[in-house]
A protein has these predicted regions:
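A hydrophobic alpha-helical transmembrane-helix feature that marks the membrane cores
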Residues: 1-285
């Protein structure tokens, strides 16, 4: 089981044999056309066709790592731009009251859209972009609130997130951190438990438990331990995401799946940032 339903869905298709059937179905008509064309081509023309390089992934509409990287950067840019706008809206003391509506709207909206994306049978690019917009609204608003409470914490969280992302990629690439079917299953169960706890924690925080910090309070050892666990889970989620992208490229899935993979990476990256932000804020106290 992957870190989120997006990669779970892709992994199931890879295990089912990818799109080998797609290759066979599309190959037959091409072969038929080629035989028909050969009747009218001379030897020189046939030699030219034979000497041409084989079609690559781009020409055949296959998924490439470049596709995933570029779409991930595009969605990341949307999150950053919208997040910056949301930040400046609530940074003004006169508009500080908008912080909670923006955070709730962004959080609940992105949760709803994320579930639709994960379980929708077709890939919807507009929904994926809309999710990035809502994530930007939420991240910008909550970052501005944390920055007012703990000056400099956002910059530290951004640097820590980027460093963790790079470190996890290198550790996965070098084989230091491995992703196996067993680790995916264990991680999937851990994620479900942590998700249920997080939802209960959000409700508890709105009820004033732990001084609006939820279970564990602001700076108790329990609260810090919960945040460390969240950072650890989000970090390993990235390793699973990297592995899923690598398997999807190897399985030669259609190019349209690059949007779904990019979306999954953004989900994990934003999750990691939020967990690090909460951990740093707790350590400040």
């Amino acid at each position: 089981m992957a870190s989120n339903p997006v990669f779970t869905r892709i992994d199931k298709q890879i295990k089912a044999g990818g799109y080998a059937g797609f290759d066979r179905q599309s190959a037959a008509p091409r072969m038929g056309r080629r035989r028909g064309v050969q009747d009218t081509l001379n030897a020189e023309q046939l030699a030219d066709l034979y000497n041409q390089p084989a079609a690559g992934p781009v020409q055949t509409g296959r998924l490439t790592l470049y596709d995933v990287v570029m779409k991930t950067l595009g969605l990341f840019a949307v999150v950053v731009v919208v997040g910056a706008a949301s930040w400046f809206v609530v940074a003004d003391p006169e508009r500080a009251g908008l912080s909670l509506p923006l955070m709730l709207g962004g959080m609940l909206g992105s949760l709803a859209i994320g579930l639709v994306i994960a379980f929708k049978k077709t890939i919807s690019v507009p929904l994926i972009v809309l999710y990035a917009v809502l994530e930007g609204v939420f991240v910008g608003a909550i970052s501005s609130v944390f920055e007012r409470m703990f000056p400099g914490v956002v910059t530290t969280a951004v640097i820590a997130t980027v460093s963790t992302f790079a470190g996890m990629f290198l550790a996965w690439k070098l084989g230091i951190i491995k992703v196996t079917d067993k680790s995916r299953r264990i991680f999937g169960m851990a994620i479900m438990g942590y998700l249920l706890f997080s939802l209960a924690n959000v409700v508890a925080s709105f009820m004033g438990v732990g001084g609006t910090w939820g279970f564990g309070g602001k700076n108790s050892l329990l609260g810090i331990g919960i945040s460390v666990l969240g950072v650890g889970l989000a970090s390993y989620s990235l390793a699973i995401d990297f592995d899923s992208v690598d398997r999807a490229v190897a399985a030669r899935l259609p190019e349209k799946y690059s949007w779904l993979l990019a979306h999954g990476l953004i989900v994990s990256l934003v999750w990691l940032y939020l967990e690090i932000l909460r951990l740093l804020a707790r350590l400040r106290e």
